[in-house]
Amino acid sequence: LQCNKLVPIASKTCPPGKNLCYKMFMVSDLTIPVKRGCIDVCPKNSLLVKYECCNTDRCN
């Protein structure tokens, strides 16, 4: 699985066991992701941050 890094022109191959790509937004600004990468389980959203997860190459 290939996931985008914070700057989407760069990507990385996820290590074994991390089979989701994610991007994290601050709830106060849902237009600019503050973090992207590989993850094993999609975190729950909170009052401050929102996560979007997906399982195809460079979907984040």
UniProtKB/Swiss-Prot annotation:
- PROSITE patterns (UniProt xref): SNAKE_TOXIN (PS00272)
Q: What GO molecular function annotation could you give as one example from this UniProt entry?
A: toxin activity
Protein source organism: Naja naja (Indian cobra)
Summary of the function given for this chain in its UniProt record: Shows cytolytic activity on many different cells by forming pore in lipid membranes. In vivo, increases heart rate or kills the animal by cardiac arrest. In addition, it binds to heparin with high affinity, interacts with Kv channel-interacting protein 1 (KCNIP1) in a calcium-independent manner, and binds to integrin alpha-V/beta-3 (ITGAV/ITGB3) with moderate affinity. Preferentially binds acidic phospholipids like phosphatidylserine, phosphatidic acid and phosphatidyl glycerol.
Q: List the disulfide bonds.
A: 3-21, 14-38, 42-53, 54-59
The terms describing its cellular component in GO are: extracellular region; membrane; other organism cell membrane
Top-rank taxon, per record: Eukaryota
User: Where is it predominantly found?
Assistant: secreted
Instruction: Cite the record's tissue specificity text.
Output: Expressed by the venom gland.
> Which BP terms does GO give this entry?
killing of cells of another organism
Q: What is the name of this protein? A: Cytotoxin 2a
**Homology family:** Belongs to the three-finger toxin family. Short-chain subfamily. Type IA cytotoxin sub-subfamily.
